[in-house]
């Protein structure tokens, strides 16, 4: 202890209590600091600027469907490394890592349940699983969703969030574009409604197939939607793209999608759309 510390009076310092981790989060758009618990109640939509943050597939389904009996479809389908693919890492290892981090077997979750009492099937992409990439299991589960609708005369709603086809499955991944499109043609032939909801981001092979084949194509605000990304396009055409290019507001203005719906209003709006499509069950 120094001589100055001996002669100066001691002051009582209050110790701040430890703040538990995971209570706060920051909006990626307006940088507002938000309570995580409040944000969860708002379905991950910022109360300050209405920025739609990414949400897990199961949380989206839980918020969208009625409480009560639900049946998961296609869960028996699990990914296989048929090609023994390896880039900087083995595909098999990437699958295991993605399964551990998301607690999902693959990038699509399909659930049969009810929307305001109306029987429906909901397919929802899990973007955290390898960028929501479409591979064999995603195609198989989507077809399982369509088959359930065909067998029970139910509408299908799909929430897309994907970077496109999964590179590690090569042509088998690309084949899912044709497979899912052919399945949806059967729904159209039978007159069953299919509503596609495009969320941030919906790109590549998913946007070029099942995501744009809805009887009504809906998007969340400011969602990035397209085939190639804006940077790739700019480098290819060597021109500056218009502001907001490939965002949902730009696309609805140009007629590429039908409407933009806030996530918090999605249940009401989609139920209303199904009623207007004269769907009855």
Curated annotation (Swiss-Prot):
Q: Which GO terms describe its biological process?
A: fatty acid biosynthetic process; malonyl-CoA biosynthetic process
Respond yes or no to whether keyword Magnesium is given for this record: no
Q: Keywords for this entry?
A: ATP-binding, Cytoplasm, Fatty acid biosynthesis, Fatty acid metabolism, Lipid biosynthesis, Lipid metabolism, Metal-binding, Nucleotide-binding, Transferase, Zinc, Zinc-finger
Question: What PROSITE patterns does this protein map onto?
Answer: COA_CT_NTER
May I have one GO cellular component term? acetate CoA-transferase complex
Q: In which pathway does it act?
A: Lipid metabolism; malonyl-CoA biosynthesis; malonyl-CoA from acetyl-CoA: step 1/1
Q: How does it assemble?
A: Acetyl-CoA carboxylase is a heterohexamer composed of biotin carboxyl carrier protein (AccB), biotin carboxylase (AccC) and two subunits each of ACCase subunit alpha (AccA) and ACCase subunit beta (AccD).
Name this polypeptide is given:
Acetyl-coenzyme A carboxylase carboxyl transferase subunit beta
Q: Which organism is it from?
A: Alteromonas mediterranea (strain DSM 17117 / CIP 110805 / LMG 28347 / Deep ecotype)
Could you tell me the gene encoding this protein?
A: accD
């Amino acid at each position: 202890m120094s001589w100055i510390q001996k002669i100066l009076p001691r002051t009582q310092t209050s110790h701040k209590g430890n703040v538990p981790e995971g209570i706060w989060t920051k909006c990626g758009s307006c940088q507002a600091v938000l309570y995580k618990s409040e944000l969860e109640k708002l379905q991950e939509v910022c109360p300050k600027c209405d920025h739609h943050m990414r949400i897990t597939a199961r949380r989206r389904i839980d918020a969208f469907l009625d409480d009560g009996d639900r049946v998961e479809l296609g869960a028996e389908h699990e990914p296989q490394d048929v090609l023994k693919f390896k880039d900087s890492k083995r595909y098999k290892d990437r699958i295991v890592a993605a399964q551990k981090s998301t607690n999902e077997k693959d990038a699509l979750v399909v659930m049969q349940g009810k929307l305001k009492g109306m029987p429906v099937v909901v397919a929802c992409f899990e973007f955290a699983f390898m960028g929501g990439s479409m591979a064999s299991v995603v195609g198989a589960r989507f077809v399982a969703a369509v088959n359930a609708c065909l067998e029970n005369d139910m509408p299908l709603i799909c929430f897309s969030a994907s970077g496109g086809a999964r590179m590690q499955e090569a042509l088998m991944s690309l084949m899912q574009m044709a497979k899912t499109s052919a399945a949806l043609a059967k729904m159209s032939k039978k007159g069953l409604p299919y509503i596609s909801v495009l969320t941030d981001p919906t790109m590549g092979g998913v946007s070029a197939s099942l995501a744009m084949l809805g009887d009504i194509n809906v998007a969340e605000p400011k969602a990035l939607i397209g085939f190639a990304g804006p940077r790739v396009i700019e480098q290819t055409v060597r021109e500056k793209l218009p502001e907001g290019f490939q965002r949902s507001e730009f696309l609805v203005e140009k007629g590429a999608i039908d409407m933009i719906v806030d996530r918090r209003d999605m249940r009401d709006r989609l139920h209303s759309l199904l009623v207007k499509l004269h769907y009855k069950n």
